[in-house]
C-alpha cells in the first residue's frame, strides 16, 4: 500500500510513476476526497470550538443565576452536529482507504519502460541449449513413457490442471525440492520455516493478494474466510505482521517448501498441456525482510541464490528485468529467471524475484527499530521462487532426455536418489 501522505502531497509525482506500469491514477478523486476531508475537518474543529465556548457560557450563566436552557439546547445541537460530522469523516476515510488499497506499487526508477513481457530486458544468460540429434519429446510424453506422469488420472480424481506423479518421477520431484532447500539453508544462510497452507484474509491483504485478486484464490467454503495459499510468500511475510523487529535481527531470510494453489482465473486456454500452469504445484520460496537502504542489494543476492540452483543442475537459463507494464501489483522491481524448455524452443519463467519495498510492510505494519533514532520504521520485504519445483522437474526431464526415452539424473540430485543415475522407460 502506498503512503497516504505521499499520495496527498505529491500526487502528480505518484501519477507519473504509476504511469510507467500503465496505471492511470485518479487524480481528480484524490483531490475531491482530500477537499471533502479538509472541509469536514474544519467544520469539526469549528463545532468543537463553539461547543467549548457555549459550555463555558453555561457555567457563567449558572453562576449569575440566568436561564441556561437556550444555551443547553444549543450545546446539544452542536453535539449532534459533531456526531454527524465525525460519521461523515469516517465515511470519507473508509472511501479513501478502499481507494488506496487498489493502487499498485510505484515501479523503481530503473525499471524499463514497456507494456508487456515482450518489452522485458534480458540482462544475462547462462549455459547453451543442447543440440539434439534425435526427435525430442516434451515432458508430458517423456513422463508417460517413464510411467510416472499421469494427467488423465488427475483429471478423473479432481479436474484439469492437476497431475499425479509416481515412482521415479515422484522421487525426482522430491529430490529437487530437498536439493533446493539444502542449498538455500547450507550455502545461502536461510532459515527453514514450515508454514500453514491455509491463511486468513488479513494475511492475504498484507501481501497484496486481497482485495484485488480474490478470483485467483481458492477459498474454503465455510464462514471463517480461510484461503489456500497461492504462494508461501503469504505466510512467511506475515510472520512479522504487527511486529517491531530490532535492527540487529535483520536481515531475516526465510525459506519454505510448500504446495501452492491458484485458480488461474485469467489463464483460460493458456499452457493447457503439461505442468507449466497447474492449479496445485510446489515451490521453494525465499523471503527477505531488511532495512530500506539494503533492499536493492538484497534483491541482487536473492536472484543469485535462485540462479545458483539452475547452475548446479546445469540447466540453460536467462535472467530478465521486467518492464513497468509487466511487474506485479505489489512489486517495485522484478527479475524473472527463465529456463530453457527444448520442446517449446524457448525460455519459460521458473522464478520471479521482487523487491516490494515498504508496500507490503505498510499493509502489515511490519517494522524495525532504527538503531540511530530509536524509532520504528517500515521494513522492506522481498520474495522470490527458489525454484518452482514442477517447472524445474519438466526442465530436467526435457533437457536430460536421451534417444531411447530415458532421462539422465543430474549429478547433484543423485545423492537424493540413492545413487540412481538414470530414469528408464517402462516397458509396455
UniProtKB/Swiss-Prot annotation:
The keyword Acetylation does not apply. SUPFAM superfamilies: Class II aaRS and biotin synthetases, tRNA-binding arm. GO terms for molecular function: ATP binding; serine-tRNA ligase activity. It is found in: Cytoplasm. Pathway: Aminoacyl-tRNA biosynthesis; selenocysteinyl-tRNA(Sec) biosynthesis; L-seryl-tRNA(Sec) from L-serine and tRNA(Sec): step 1/1. InterPro entries: aa-tRNA-synt_IIb, aa-tRNA-synth_II, aa-tRNA-synth_II/BPL/LPL, Ser-tRNA-ligase_type_1, Ser-tRNA-synth_1_N, SerRS_1_N_sf, SerRS_core, tRNA-bd_arm. One of its GO terms (cellular component) is cytoplasm. Keywords: Aminoacyl-tRNA synthetase, ATP-binding, Cytoplasm, Ligase, Nucleotide-binding, Protein biosynthesis. ATP binds at residues 262-264, 349-352. Catalyzes the attachment of serine to tRNA(Ser). Is also able to aminoacylate tRNA(Sec) with serine, to form the misacylated tRNA L-seryl-tRNA(Sec), which will be further converted into selenocysteinyl-tRNA(Sec). This is Serine--tRNA ligase. It comes from Cellvibrio japonicus (strain Ueda107) (Pseudomonas fluorescens subsp. cellulosa).
Amino acid at each position: 500500500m502506498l503512503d497516504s501522505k505521499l499520495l496527498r502531497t505529491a500526487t502528480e509525482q505518484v501519477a507519473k510513476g504509476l504511469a510507467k506500469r500503465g496505471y492511470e491514477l485518479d487524480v481528480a478523486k484524490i483531490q475531491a476526497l482530500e477537499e471533502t476531508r479538509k472541509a469536514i475537518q474544519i467544520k469539526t474543529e469549528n463545532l468543537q470550538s463553539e461547543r467549548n465556548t457555549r459550555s463555558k457560557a453555561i457555567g457563567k450563566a449558572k453562576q449569575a443565576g440566568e436561564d441556561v436552557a437556550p444555551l443547553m439546547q444549543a450545546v446539544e445541537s452542536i453535539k449532534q452536529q459533531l456526531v454527524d460530522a465525525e460519521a461523515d469523516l469516517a465515511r470519507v476515510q473508509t472511501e479513501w482507504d478502499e481507494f488506496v488499497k487498489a493502487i499498485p506499487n510505484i515501479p523503481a526508477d530503473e525499471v524499463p519502460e514497456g507494456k508487456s513481457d515482450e518489452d522485458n530486458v534480458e540482462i544475462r544468460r547462462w549455459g547453451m541449449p543442447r543440440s539434439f540429434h534425435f526427435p525430442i519429446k516434451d515432458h508430458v510424453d517423456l513422463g508417460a513413457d517413464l510411467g510416472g506422469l499421469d494427467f488423465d488420472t488427475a483429471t478423473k480424481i479432481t479436474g484439469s490442471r492437476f497431475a499425479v506423479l509416481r515412482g521415479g518421477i515422484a522421487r525426482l520431484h522430491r529430490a529437487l525440492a530437498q536439493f533446493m532447500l539444502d542449498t538455500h539453508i547450507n550455502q545461502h544462510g536461510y532459515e527453514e520455516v514450515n508454514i500453514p497452507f491455509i491463511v486468513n484474509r488479513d494475511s492475504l491483504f498484507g501481501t497484496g493478494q486481497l482485495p484485488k485478486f480474490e478470483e485467483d484464490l481458492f477459498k474454503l467454503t465455510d464462514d471463517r474466510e480461510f484461503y489456500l495459499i497461492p504462494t508461501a510468500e503469504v505466510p512467511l511475510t506475515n510472520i512479522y505482521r504487527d511486529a517491531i523487529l530490532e535492527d540487529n535481527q535483520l536481515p531475516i531470510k526465510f525459506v519454505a517448501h510448500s504446495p501452492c494453489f491458484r485458480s488461474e482465473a485469467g489463464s483460460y486456454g493458456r499452457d493447457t498441456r503439461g505442468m507449466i500452469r497447474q492449479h496445485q504445484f510446489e515451490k521453494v520460496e525465499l523471503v527477505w525482510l531488511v532495512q530500506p537502504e539494503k533492499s536493492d542489494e538484497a534483491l541482487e543476492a536473492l536472484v543469485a541464490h535462485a540462479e545458483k540452483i539452475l547452475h548446479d543442475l546445469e540447466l540453460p537459463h536467462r535472467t530478465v528485468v521486467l518492464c513497468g507494464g509487466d511487474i506485479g501489483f505489489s512489486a517495485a522491481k522484478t527479475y524473472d529467471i527463465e529456463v530453457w524448455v527444448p520442446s517449446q524452443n524457448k525460455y519459460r519463467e521458473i522464478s520471479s524475484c521482487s523487491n516490494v519495498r515498504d508496500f507490503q510492510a505498510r499493509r502489515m505494519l511490519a517494522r524495525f527499530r532504527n538503531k540511530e533514532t530509536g524509532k520504528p520504521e517500515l521494513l522492506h520485504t522481498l520474495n522470490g521462487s527458489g525454484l518452482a519445483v514442477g517447472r524445474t522437474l519438466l526442465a530436467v526431464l526435457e533437457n536430460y532426455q536421451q534417444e531411447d526415452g530415458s532421462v539422465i539424473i543430474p549429478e547433484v540430485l543423485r545423492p537424493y536418489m540413492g545413487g540412481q543415475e538414470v530414469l528408464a522407460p517402462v516397458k509396455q
